[in-house]
């Protein structure tokens, strides 16, 4: 009740402030974002040595209310909301509110392009860059839906770039200081050719109980060739990139290690059916995964957010269908098969449904 009253007071203050300014006008927008997620992992064929069999089955609702004020050159906005998630089969609704959403956004349009800055607790969906699953796995994208920090974006006719800061933890007795810097960009060189990059630097510092610092960095410059323009195909593309990593446990190693490799992704898309193959060739991009900090706590998924199979040769095949149901409804049904140098590891079946209903409200 207290949180709800605070939110109402904040919006009332913003509305009153805008009305007091000459020409001030607040545009209100109510948004409801619903996400249904089903992901069934079957890895018994490999003895669940790398990934365990299991199912993630959840429904997410993100209601938000936004207010925008038109300035001289910039549109200023404030958004308040909540991230609600229910895990199917759970016997309690107490954990339904997962995280609050509160962020400021400023958008400026120029002749060269559009710049947008965001600060606060904002949804990951505001980011538009491309990142390999070596950076973020499909499960991580679902479970870590919001960032706490800032986001900067620039879009021009043939160029896009973004940079984000996610402050994930403040140092305490048993709490680590953690923050992540992420960036991506795309340059449309020609109709069928684009160049780009993805970058991630993760600072995983120690707590008072377990001092020490671990640095994890990953950079992927890439190029993409898409032969679909001018044909009946939606996509006929080949993307190739070099994965360059930087790993350093400062308390246990005198110098960092720099394992790396190459990644190639081929995609065919027609009639909203996608067939995609991804192959990675190279070294172990997760060398500290099985390591522990000075208190004996494993690094594991606390240090690496990408797919677990990037420890050597890795091949993944995806087949999925994304039918067009409505403008605001997206459905995805698919299956993925995973191979490493040890052979067949397992497969997964996924269903995702997203309904994003944005409703402008009458301005004051």
Feature names for model-found ranges:
Residues 23, 56, 67-73, 110-114, ...:
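A generic beta-sheet turn/junction motif
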Residues 44-51, 92, 133-134, 295-302:
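Flexible, solvent-exposed loop segments that connect beta-strands
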Residues 18-99, 106-110, 347-363:
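Beta-barrel outer-membrane channel/assembly domains of diderm bacteria
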Residues 33, 156, 160-162, 168, ...:
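Exposed, low-structure sequence patches enriched in small/polar residues
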């Amino acid at each position: 009740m207290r949180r709800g009253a605070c939110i109402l007071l904040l919006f009332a203050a913003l509305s009153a402030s805008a009305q007091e300014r000459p020409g001030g006008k607040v545009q209100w927008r109510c948004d409801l974002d619903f996400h249904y997620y089903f992901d069934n992992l079957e890895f018994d064929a490999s003895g669940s040595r790398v990934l365990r069999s299991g199912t993630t089955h959840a429904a997410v609702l993100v209601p938000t209310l936004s207010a925008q004020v038109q300035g001289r050159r910039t549109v200023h906005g404030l958004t308040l909301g909540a991230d609600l998630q229910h895990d199917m089969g759970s016997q309690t609704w107490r954990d339904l509110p997962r995280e609050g959403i509160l962020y400021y956004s400023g958008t400026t349009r120029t002749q060269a392009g559009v710049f947008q800055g965001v600060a606060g607790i904002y949804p990951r969906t505001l980011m538009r860059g491309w990142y390999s699953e070596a950076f973020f796995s499909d499960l991580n994208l679902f479970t870590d839906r919001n960032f706490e920090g800032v986001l900067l974006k620039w879009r021009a006719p043939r160029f896009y770039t973004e940079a984000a800061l996610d402050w994930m933890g403040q140092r305490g007795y048993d709490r680590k200081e953690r923050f992540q810097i992420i960036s991506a960009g795309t340059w449309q060189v020609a109709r069928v050719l684009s160049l780009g990059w993805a970058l991630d630097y993760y600072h995983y510092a120690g707590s008072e109980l377990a001092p020490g610092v671990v640095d994890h960095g990953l950079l992927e410059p890439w190029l993409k060739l898409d032969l679909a323009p001018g044909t009946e195909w939606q996509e006929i593309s080949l993307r190739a990139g070099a994965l360059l990593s930087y790993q350093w446990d400062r308390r246990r190693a005198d110098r960092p290690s720099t394992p790396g490799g190459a990644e190639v992704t081929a995609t065919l898309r027609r009639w909203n059916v996608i067939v995609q193959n991804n192959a990675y060739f190279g070294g172990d991009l997760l060398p500290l995964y099985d390591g522990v900090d000075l208190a004996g706590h494993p690094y594991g998924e606390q240090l690496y957010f990408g797919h677990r199979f990037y420890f050597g040769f890795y091949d993944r095949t995806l087949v999925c269908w994304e039918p067009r149901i409505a403008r605001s409804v997206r459905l995805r049904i698919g299956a993925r098969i995973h191979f490493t140098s040890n052979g067949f590891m397992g497969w997964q079946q996924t269903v995702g449904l997203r309904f994003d209903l944005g409703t402008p409200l009458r301005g004051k």
